[in-house]
């Protein structure tokens, strides 16, 4: 989106992503090292911190990445826009707004809360202009999305679907395109700095409802969807560190997990991608891959 606006965009990752998008400069660097970042970009106007270290390493990796990126922003005089999530709030009651306190007690939630608290302190001290976007679970085509690789390929192949947590609790879902749009809007608007913003997202849907919408888009009428179950979730967590961390955030899928994005929508005039388009875009990725492999 930035390249389409004619901006010079440098994408930094630990291994070259080969995105193949015209206008992007792809460079390799270690985001946890200030020196490494300075070798690939000696100056910048805006830094978008979209780092996503392995889920089970957040406690160790996030402090290093955040410290390095923040120092890099201060060295170059750049503004900083952080891509985050809702983990920092921890278990809660009611619809989440940006005013909710950050009171997470599990490792990954504490890690994300600390990133914001430290950067907010730099902002308030006048050392850095920073803002943070907070999205709910992404609905997109990849292995980390609950509605991605775990659902669509199985529907296409006629296989049963098993999902972690309750499949009948309302949940807010976020499209990554809406994350990108908000991050860009925040960087271009002085009203954004010094506070977090929730990503514009559609009305909540249960996991069962989302699977039904995906199945309808695929033209699949006969399918099975069920929860994994608490016992099996715990057993899987013994052997899989990612599932073990997901289990620690189980509260997100055992009761309503609903987010208000009213502030961002009203302040910046944004709205979420229409839900039917979210589903169409999701399915399109898998249909394309299926056609290539078929």
Go through each PLM region and give its residues.
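Conserved catalytic-site region of short-chain dehydrogenase/reductase
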Residues: 56, 86-96, 138-145
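Substrate-positioning beta->alpha
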Residues: 143-150, 164-187, 194-198
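Conserved beta-loop-beta element that borders a ligand/cofactor-binding pocket
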Residues: 85, 118-142
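Conserved Rossmann-fold NAD(P)-dependent oxidoreductase catalytic core, especially the SDR/UDP-sugar
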Residues: 10, 67-114, 123, 131
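Terminal hydrophobic/aromatic helix or amphipathic segment near a protein terminus
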Residues: 212-258, 291-292
